[in-house]
Amino acid sequence: MLRTTRGPGLGPPLLQAALGLGRAGWHWPAGRAASGGRGRAWLQPTGRETGVQVYNSLTGRKEPLIVAHAEAASWYSCGPTVYDHAHLGHACSYVRFDIIRRILTKVFGCSIVMVMGITDVDDKIIKRANEMNISPASLASLYEEDFKQDMAALKVLPPTVYLRVTENIPQIISFIEGIIARGNAYSTAKGNVYFDLKSRGDKYGKLVGVVPGPVGEPADSDKRHASDFALWKAAKPQEVFWASPWGPGRPGWHIECSAIASMVFGSQLDIHSGGIDLAFPHHENEIAQCEVFHQCEQWGNYFLHSGHLHAKGKEEKMSKSLKNYITIKDFLKTFSPDVFRFFCLRSSYRSAIDYSDSAMLQAQQLLLGLGSFLEDARAYMKGQLACGSVREAMLWERLSSTKRAVKAALADDFDTPRVVDAILGLAHHGNGQLRASLKEPEGPRSPAVFGAIISYFEQFFETVGISLANQQYVSGDGSEATLHGVVDELVRFRQKVRQFALAMPEATGDARRQQLLERQPLLEACDTLRRGLTAHGINIKDRSSTTSTWELLDQRTKDQKSAG
């Protein structure tokens, strides 16, 4: 069994000294500005105004996002309980908050210090480890690494620091001792420690206003009140445990996040995030624990919750317990992380979202359409795409209005569906100006405005973690540049052969027909080469008798074209 002696108290928070976080420097506004949501008072912090209105679960409405320190915002994210593979329900929440984090950083200039707790000891971990006949520590280590690999595959930025529960047991014990010392928790003869919910009076329930009932309580429970929740669990036979003042045991779930977040950020937290299913009882209990320990009126200023991912046509969320989930690894065998991220962008982070293959295919086609538009825009800039006169002034105005609309939507609780609509609208107008024409343009060409649109699209999608280049070129170890050059040369050679074969012979009559007949094998060879490259995922577009362009296909489109 794992054992450890008690360590020192919480001590100085890990990152406070370096980043100026924690209680110091934070104060209530003059007159304690308060807003009430759902009957609760919310104390508006002072500090740096980000320019963003965010839906705060503490008030049930949008509030101005104000972070305590100009240099960095403090953000605690509930991490995984590492006992199995992560699934798309987890992915949806982490990708949505990753998008928000990127937007705050890159659009609104708000640096973020993010801490994520890893629950690496838990009833589920112990049960699964026993089933697999391995130690809980080995199981947790295996699936923690698996989780991190999945997040990297989805392009979710890692937190500033991961903190494991098992590596912070002394700090958790000290946190529990602090709550007991303040009269809000009690130990029992069996070695358990519980939070005394009645000791909070009407202060409990700031987040959702629900008091837990006695549902599912064992007959031999040693709680004073059925609604009390565990801070420390006495060890059961054959379970992992740590030494404590109350006997061998391990932490309860809720206390882990409270202690870890406080260890880094102290008594004041800007942002706390998680799935909506964590709001109660987990986040509610975190608030109660932290406000007791720190003796403060408001520990976390903003609670952000993401909606559930549902299997289409199902009311229940995607979860392991319901066995209705798709693992991230299985999903990525069919669709790219960019497609999933775009799928997430199309709905509010707070809303429930239905998963289906058709929804993913629609997201994929929209993303491919954007990539195709950028390819056409580049072809136009290179003089490879002939089209009629371009309404340049209109496109400049559309670009300007799109930028304004996108910034306004992002500042309005990260309204990404509005952003996607604005982006697709600009692409639609741009495509409308790039319709191929056999006629020479009546006015001068206007490549600069398309260059500006390309630059804006690439900048925006890079901001939210999507690579539009991957819709055209291969990503990977740097070999795409070489591949790009080789295919460019091949397409240029084919283009010259095709141009020669299609050129009208100067001869007439039988001589002319003979020349055309002689050139037919060249055209057939060009078509054969195009089909062969399509089978390898390279699609050549003949835009006229003199110009051709190419793009890389995703696997599904490649299979469809090859079958056709």
Swiss-Prot record:
**NCBIfam families xrefs:** cysS (TIGR00435)
Q: Where is this motif: 'KIIK' region?
A: 124-127
Q: Which InterPro entries match?
A: Cys-tRNA-ligase, Cys-tRNA/MSH_ligase, Rossmann-like_a/b/a_fold, tRNA-synt_1_cat_dom, tRNAsynth_Ia_anticodon-bd
What gene is this protein a product of?
CARS2
| The protein's role, per its UniProt record | Mitochondrial cysteine-specific aminoacyl-tRNA synthetase that catalyzes the ATP-dependent ligation of cysteine to tRNA(Cys). In addition to its role as an aminoacyl-tRNA synthetase, has also cysteine persulfide synthase activity. Produces reactive persulfide species such as cysteine persulfide (CysSSH) from substrate cysteine and mediate direct incorporation of CysSSH into proteins during translations, resulting in protein persulfides and polysulfides. CysSSHs behave as potent antioxidants and cellular protectants.
Per UniProt, subcellular location reads as: Mitochondrion
GO terms under cellular component: cytoplasm; mitochondrion
Q: Which UniProt keywords apply?
A: Aminoacyl-tRNA synthetase, ATP-binding, Disease variant, Ligase, Metal-binding, Mitochondrion, Nucleotide-binding, Primary mitochondrial disease, Protein biosynthesis, Transit peptide, Zinc
- Record-listed ATP binding positions: K320
Protein family = Belongs to the class-I aminoacyl-tRNA synthetase family.
Show where the record puts the motif 'KMSKS' region: 317-321
Task: Tell me the organism.
Answer: Homo sapiens (Human)
Kindly state which reaction or reactions the protein catalyses. tRNA(Cys) + L-cysteine + ATP = L-cysteinyl-tRNA(Cys) + AMP + diphosphate; 2 L-cysteine = S-sulfanyl-L-cysteine + L-alanine; S-sulfanyl-L-cysteine + L-cysteine = S-disulfanyl-L-cysteine + L-alanine; S-sulfanyl-L-cysteine + tRNA(Cys) + ATP = (S)-sulfanyl-L-cysteinyl-tRNA(Cys) + AMP + diphosphate
Protein name from the UniProt record: Probable cysteine--tRNA ligase, mitochondrial
Q: Which residues bind L-cysteine?
A: G79, T119, H282
Q: How is the cofactor bound?
A: Binds 1 zinc ion per subunit.
- Listed Pfam families: tRNA-synt_1e
The UniProt-reported impact of C78D is: No effect on cysteine persulfide synthase activity. Loss of cysteine--tRNA ligase activity
Q: Which GO terms describe its biological process?
A: cysteinyl-tRNA aminoacylation
- Identify the EC number(s): 6.1.1.16
Comment block on domains: 'KIIK' region and 'KMSKS' region are required for cysteine persulfide synthase activity.
Pathology noted in the record is: Combined oxidative phosphorylation deficiency 27: An autosomal recessive mitochondrial disorder characterized by multiple mitochondrial respiratory-chain-complex deficiencies causing neurological regression, progressive cognitive decline, complex movement disorder, epileptic encephalopathy, progressive spastic tetraparesis, and progressive impairment of vision and hearing.
Residues that bind Zn(2+): C78, C257, H282, E286
